[in-house]
Amino acid sequence: MKLAVITDSTATLPIDLKQDKAIFSLDIPVIIDDETYFEGRNLSIDDFYQKMADSKNLPKTSQPSLSELDNLLGLLSSKGYTHVIGLFLAGGISGFWQNIQFLAEEHPEIEMAFPDSKITSAPLGSMVKNVLDWSRQGMTFQAILNKLQEQIDGTTAFIMVDDLNHLVKGGRLSNGSALLGNLLSIKPILRFDEEGKIVVYEKVRTEKKAMKRLVEILNDLIADGQYNVSIIHSKAQDKADYLKRLLQDSGYQYDIEEVHFGAVIATHLGEGAIAFGVTPRL
C-alpha cells in the first residue's frame, strides 16, 4: 500500500509534516475587498490582520478548488499511490467535504476515503500526522480508517470569541445567538458539536469567568483518558498565556501545544479568539 494524505490549509502542521512527500495540502482562498489571497503564498498572517483591520468589510473565504483536488488525485495515481485519505475542514462549517464524495467514482484505480474530520486547526493536523504514522507502522487501510474514526469521535474544540459578528456574517452562527450575546455583554463559549458545527455551548458573564469555565470544561473532558491538548488563538497571545497558566494551576501536567489560527479560520472567528482543542492519544 502506498498511501497519500490530503488536507487543507486550515490544518496546523509542523514543518517536517509540511515537507513530507506523502502529504498534500489544498489552499483555501481568503477574499478581502474583492482580492483573492492564499495564506503562505501571497498572504502572511500579519498581513491578513492588517488587511482585515483596514477593510470596511469582513473578509470572506471560499472552498478549495474541486478541479485542483481532481487533478491531484490523477497525479497521485500516476505516481503509484494506491490509497488516499483526505482530511479537510469540518463538514459542519464547509460544504467542501460533502462536495468531494463523488471523486471516488472518478478515480476507481485508487482506494480513497474522505471521512468528515468535524474539526480544524491543531486537532486536524494531529489526525493527518497519525494517519501517516499508522500507515508507516504497517497498518491496513481499513485499520487506519477505524483508528481515525476513533480519533474523530473523541476530538472537539471549545472557543471564546471577541466579536460574534464574524461568525454570523460567515454563516457559521445564527444572528439570534450573536444578538443575545452582544446585548447582554455575554461571552458565549462555543464548541464544535458532533456534526462538526460551531454551536453555543454556554453563556458566561465576563471574559475572566469564561476563561476559568474553559479550564473547567477541559478538565472534565480529559478526566477519563489520555488526550493531547492544544491552545489556539487568533492574535491573542495574552489570552493564550493566561489560559495556559490557568490550566497548569489546575493541575494539568502534560505538554500543551500552542498555535495560532490561520487566516481562513481567523476570518470567521475574528481577532482575539481563544480556543482549546482536545484529541485522544491513540
Curated annotation (Swiss-Prot):
Q: One MF term in GO for this entry?
A: lipid binding
Q: Start and end of every DegV domain? A: 3-280
Protein function: May bind long-chain fatty acids, such as palmitate, and may play a role in lipid transport or fatty acid metabolism.
* InterPro entries to which the protein is assigned, alphabetical: DegV (IPR003797), DegV_C (IPR043168), DegV_domain_contain (IPR050270)
Gene3D superfamilies in the record, alphabetically? 3.30.1180.10, 3.40.50.10170
Any signal peptide, and if so, which residues? none
Residue numbers binding hexadecanoate: T61, S94
Protein's recorded name: DegV domain-containing protein SpyM3_0586
Highest rank taxon of the organism: Bacteria
What keywords does the record list, in alphabetical order?
Answer: Lipid-binding
Q: Which Pfam families match?
A: DegV
